[in-house]
Regions:
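Bacterial N-terminal signal peptides that target proteins for export
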Residues: 1-11
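N-terminal signal peptide c-region/cleavage motif recognized by signal peptidases
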Residues: 17-19
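N-terminal ligand-binding lobe of clamshell/alpha-beta domains
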Residues: 22-377
């Protein structure tokens, strides 16, 4: 239950039996803020529906048991994930949903009515949260915010974030077990790359959400999938042109750079762009359709004549790896594409299946990536 400073002595007496199960702790979140609250938290608001990707790891038996509200984005951004969880945990369809901080549709009164012990927010929402005064407003009604991060600095902050959430949920041992798995799986790539004296790094262009819009082309600069590429032994083509984490590369620059490999992030975004050209990779994806749409994207002006297309070095991978604790799987798959000889024995699909077997309550379904064949002359 929430640590409420205005509780009367009589109310505290009534709550003694429940409070005995929790105690005040101080957590330092990834934003460097010290947050004091009672843990384990019994009532949690998720600032994003896709945060179930970490909640399910730490509370596998009942991942929605403590969730009293969440942002309505999982069903739109990853409908297959939503369906898989809804099939096993139908109660998720009854969880109240709310708008976002960034677009100003979050309802303070609704949050208060849900009586949460804590609200977990992604670090990228912090600026909008502060600008709108939500942090201060929620603090005044006794609802603390804890920031976590799998997106801005994923490889620094994923273990930290899982440890923080483990403290919130009273699942420290589970968080430590996951972090050990995470670090071991990352080391299967980074240790090999670090051991190479004269590594030839392929030039890799990563298109962010290719086909989502007609714009060409969103990409990753110094961070996120751009860092994934580098950790996997590649050179991020967009890094010199995009100083921030995300940005845009024009078609002429792609042609001039002539990357060795092209990777497009994708997902089923029918809810956002009905009938769009996006690549619908993800759990249970139709691989034939994904491959066909990926081939069609390579017919755009920025990709015609690029050597990677003719060589069959064109791939698509699940976009949601960019903002959840499973990012190590993407790094393994990128390493497999970028250095097949070095990672002949690495099986990212087996890694993802093991992740599901050990840490998730839903079954593994393949479909998270696809590749094109070389162009035959």
């Amino acid at each position: 239950m929430t640590l409420r400073y205005r509780l009367s002595a009589s109310a505290l007496t009534l709550l003694t039996a429940t409070a005995a199960l929790a105690e005040p702790i101080t957590i330092t979140d990834v934003a460097g803020r010290d947050v004091t609250l009672e843990a384990p938290a019994e009532r949690v608001i998720l600032g994003e529906g896709r945060q179930i990707f970490f909640a399910a790891v730490l509370d596998t038996e009942d991942p929605f048991g403590r969730i009293v509200g969440w942002r309505e984005d999982l069903q739109q951004a990853s409908p297959e994930s939503y369906a898989a969880y809804a099939e096993k945990f139908p109660e998720l369809t009854d969880i109240p949903t709310f708008g976002g901080f960034k677009d100003g549709t979050f309802d303070i009164e609704q949050a208060v009515a849900l009586d949460p012990d804590v609200m977990i927010m992604n670090l990228e929402a912090k600026a909008a949260t502060e600008e709108a005064g939500y942090e201060e407003k929620l603090a005044k009604v006794g609802i603390p915010i804890v920031y976590i991060d799998f997106r801005e600095q994923p490889f620094d902050n994923t273990p930290k974030s899982m440890e923080i959430i483990g403290q919130l949920f009273g699942a420290q041992d589970r968080a430590a077990e996951f972090n050990a798995f995470y670090e071991a799986q990352m080391a299967r790539v980074t240790d090999v790359i670090a051991a190479q004296e004269n590594l030839e790094r392929p030039l890799v262009f990563v298109e962010r959400a290719g086909g989502y819009s007609e714009e060409c082309c969103l990409s990753f600069g110094n961070g996120n999938f751009g860092t994934f590429v580098e950790l996997a032994g590649g050179e991020n083509m967009a890094k010199p042109f995009i100083p921030a984490t995300f940005g845009t590369i024009n078609a002429e620059q792609i042609i001039a750079s002539d990357p060795d490999q092209i990777v497009v992030t994708g997902g089923n975004w029918e809810a956002y762009v009905p009938g769009g050209d996006w690549i619908g990779v993800g759990p249970g994806a139709d691989m034939a359709e994904a491959k066909s749409k990926l081939a069609a994207l390579m017919q755009r002006p920025g990709f015609t004549g690029v050597a990677a297309v003719d060589a069959g070095e064109v791939h698509a991978i699940w976009h949601q790896f960019y903002n959840n604790p499973y990012s190590f799987v993407a790094v393994q798959q990128l390493a497999k594409w970028q250095h097949p000889d070095l990672f002949r024995d690495l099986d990212p699909e087996a890694t993802l299946a093991e992740l599901h077997d050990r840490f998730l309550p839903i079954d593994y379904r393949p479909g998270y990536w696809v590749s094109l064949d070389p162009v035959s002359n």
